[in-house]
Regions:
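N-terminal accessory regions of nucleic-acid-interacting proteins
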Residues: 1-58, 138, 191, 205-230
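Conserved DEDDh/DEDDy metal-dependent 3′-5′ exonuclease domain
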Residues: 33-46, 53-60, 66-188, 192-199
Length: 230
C-alpha cells in the first residue's frame, strides 16, 4: 500500500495534487488502440448513432480549426463520441450536425464525459441550438479528488503516468482528409475522458498517496505579503 503523506503547515505554501510541465513532458506517450470511424456522410451518421445509443457512457470532445489572426473565428469542425472500444469522428464541418447526434447530446439518460466543455456548448448552441444534457465536465469533477490541474493531459498524467500528446491540436481540422495522426489524437482525447471518469469512480484515487501531491507556493499568500509591504 502506498504511504499516505503527512501534510505540514509551511507559511506561504499550499498542498495540492499537480504535475509540472517538465514532469509531464518526461512521461511516456499514450497511444490509441481502438477502432476509429470517420463519419463524413449523413447515412453513416445514422448507423453510428444506433451503436452509440446502446452505450451507458460516452467520451465527448470537439476539434476546431485554429485561428491565427485577431477577430478570426471558426466553428466546430469535428465532434468525437467514444465508447470503450471505438470512436466516431463526426465531420460536422462537412455534414452539419446530424439530428441523431444532437439527440444523443441532449439525452439526459446517456452519460457523456468531457473536459472544459463550456466553450464547446456555446459554439454548438450558436450553430445548432444545442441544449446539452447528461454531461459531466472533468475539469470540475476532479476537484473533489484534490486535483488542482484542469487540462485533460495533466489529469491523465497524474492518474496514469502517461502523456497525451497535444501535437495535433493546432492542425487544420477542416482539411479535406484527416490524417491518421489527427484521427488518433481526436479519438484518444475522447476515450481518455471515459478512462479518467471510470478510474476515479471504480478504482478510487487517494491523492494523499500520489507522488504529485505536495507543497506548492500559495499565490494568495504571496499576494497578501506584497499588499502588506505597499
Amino acid at each position: 500500500m502506498d504511504k499516505i503523506k503527512e501534510e505540514t503547515t509551511t507559511p506561504g505554501k499550499i498542498w495540492k495534487t499537480s504535475i509540472t510541465k517538465s514532469e509531464l513532458s518526461q512521461l511516456p506517450a499514450e497511444s490509441y488502440h481502438g477502432n476509429i470511424i470517420v463519419i463524413d456522410r449523413a447515412e453513416a451518421a445514422v448507423e453510428a448513432c444506433e451503436i452509440l445509443r446502446r452505450e451507458k457512457i460516452l467520451g465527448f470532445d470537439t476539434e476546431t480549426r485554429p485561428t491565427f489572426k485577431s477577430g478570426q473565428h471558426h466553428n466546430v469542425a469535428l465532434l468525437q463520441l467514444s465508447t470503450h472500444t471505438e470512436c466516431f469522428l463526426f465531420r460536422i464541418n462537412i455534414i452539419g450536425m446530424p439530428k441523431c447526434v444532437l439527440d444523443i447530446l441532449e439525452d439526459e439518460h446517456i452519460l457523456k464525459i468531457g473536459v472544459s466543455i463550456h466553450d464547446d456548448f456555446l459554439n454548438l448552441h450558436k450553430c445548432y441550438k444545442l441544449e446539452p444534457k447528461g454531461f459531466i465536465d472533468l475539469q470540475a469533477y476532479v476537484k473533489s479528488y484534490n486535483i488542482a490541474d484542469n487540462s485533460l493531459s495533466r489529469i491523465y498524467g497524474i492518474l496514469f503516468d502517461k502523456r497525451i500528446s497535444k501535437g495535433q491540436r493546432l492542425s487544420n481540422w477542416e482539411t479535406q482528409v484527416l490524417t491518421q495522426c489527427q484521427q488518433e489524437y481526436a479519438a484518444l482525447d475522447a476515450l481518455a475522458c471515459i478512462t479518467i471518469y471510470e478510474y476515479l469512480n471504480k478504482d478510487g484515487f487517494d491523492y494523499r498517496t500520489s507522488k504529485y501531491y505536495r507543497e506548492f507556493d500559495d499565490p494568495n499568500y504571496q499576494q497578501a505579503q506584497q499588499e502588506k509591504t505597499t
